[in-house]
Curated annotation (Swiss-Prot):
One of its GO terms (cellular component) is axon. It comes from the Eukaryota. It comes from Exiliboa placata. The keyword Transferase does not apply. This is Neurotrophin-3.
Length: 163
């Protein structure tokens, strides 16, 4: 995992792996087939997948197979992982009130230059130019297309003043 200068904390591969392992152990990383605990003859507990008959019974009750309800993340798990702070990922106990800004400089608390923000406007996600703009004079054109899409001829010389 590479860390950028925008990251507030230091992320190492070991710490992220342990975090992912914790999520997997908590059962929120993958959807699981419902399991049932059963006792063997010697008294040991084992986990057993539900039989097809039980799965059919669940399906008849309106429960879809392969569907697991949204699992809430334990608040203690979030408190333990506070060190993973990043502008792209935020682990929080509360739902966000609004979508995050694209860049940190778009936040009004970070950027108090309102005149610059009004002048430049906010950047928009996913908007990229399809071609590079070019600012130079073109002198060898004899025809062009105007803003309404009509073909027009380009004058090579414009005479001004009394003719």
């Amino acid at each position: 995992i590479q860390s950028t200068s925008m990251d507030q904390g230091i992320l190492t591969e070991d710490s992220m792996n342990s975090f992912i392992r914790t999520l997997i152990q908590a059962g929120i990383w993958k959807n699981k087939v419902p399991k049932q605990t059963a006792r063997t003859k010697d008294g040991m507990q084992t986990t057993v997948k539900k039989t097809e008959a039980e799965a059919d019974a669940m399906a008849s009750k309106g429960t879809r197979l392969g569907f697991q309800p949204v699992v809430s993340v334990d608040a203690e798990l979030l408190r333990q992982q506070r060190r993973f702070s990043s502008p792209r990922v935020l682990l929080s106990e509360n739902a966000p009130l609004q979508p995050p800004p694209l860049y940190l400089t778009e936040e009004p608390t970070v950027l108090n230059r309102t005149s610059r923000r009004k002048r430049e406007g906010k950047s928009h996600r996913g908007e990229y130019s399809v071609c590079d703009s070019e600012s130079r004079w073109v002198t060898d054109k004899s025809s062009a297309v105007d803003i309404r899409g009509h073909q027009v001829s380009v004058l090579g010389e414009i005479r001004m003043g009394p003719s």
